[in-house]
Amino acid sequence: MAGKSDLPVIARDDNLSEETKTLISSLPTYQDSHVKLCKYQGCWYYHNTLQAVINYQRNFQPQDTDIILASFPKSGTTWLKALSVAIVERSKQPFDDDPLTHPLLSDNPHGIVPFFEFDMYLKTSTPDLTKFSTSSPRLFSTHMPLHTFKEGLKGSPCKVVYMCRNIKDVLISDWHFRSKYSNNEVSRSTLESMFESFCGGVSFYGPFWDHALSYWRGSLENPKHVLFMRYEEMKTEPCVQVKRLAEFLGFPFTKEEEDSGSISKLLELCSLGNLSGLEVNKTGKTWMNYDYKSYFRKGEVGDWKNHLTPEMENKIDMIIEEKLKGSDLKF
């Protein structure tokens, strides 16, 4: 097994309070060849990440104008962040202004929209939020399922956007991402091991189906509070979906903007080709030393067909169909 220092800080267990250590000792646990996971409120977390989740739940002070971008890992999070930043930024900087000063050209979307669990509450229970004091709305992000995440909102009606993606493409994207940050070759045996874990519901932030269902049901119960978006629809009808996102966030496109091509300009600014080609995303890193370029790969729908066997496809499809039965959520 990898030593502690070889693991990403989110996957270690060196930042735990005594209270959290005691809690973990009472939780269901799982250990693969590299890291330990524990199941808290129905979701699997690395130990340090669980500490961050608890810190967030207890100490975050929401504002009603906050915008929270949620997703299961490797579901189009970077793209959702870029689009949301660009939509909100229009109120401060129209596209006709100097484009070179746009924040997306000088920072990665993950640098602009921090994760509660990784960027804010991982190292401290009381992060400094003063840099957001002049921002309205404030943009944050999370991978927590809705029922866990809502504890930190303390009843606030702030906007929550969830991006959902086909689990098979999520799996392939996660497989490639793990290989990048661990500097290992893309291994078929690793994919097969990850596949079995995914099917068993044991993965970082898994089970996938419970995660998606939490936001799906939340969007049905309170559509003004939670917007459920699909990665595949973003790819097939980007203009329609960006308009939908902008309206939900409270920054709808005017007729003049639509007529002048603002939606197309925004989509081009946030495109994989444009963002991945920027110097900051070719050479920059997160504070956890992840290369920004590792967040950009193919972004394709259906890439899983190049990697999963028909038997694997059938197995995971049957599991998803069973787990989502009666919910009206389909893939």
From Swiss-Prot:
GO molecular function, one term: sulfotransferase activity
The UniProt record lists the keyword Membrane: no
Positions bound to 3'-phosphoadenylyl sulfate: 74-79, 165, 173, 231, 297-299
Gene Ontology CC annotations of this record: cytoplasm
Protein EC: 2.8.2.-
Compartments reported by the entry: Cytoplasm
Active site per the UniProt annotation: 143 (proton acceptor)
Function, in words: Sulfotransferase that utilizes 3'-phospho-5'-adenylyl sulfate (PAPS) as sulfonate donor.
Protein's recorded name: Cytosolic sulfotransferase 1
Annotated source species: Arabidopsis thaliana (Mouse-ear cress)
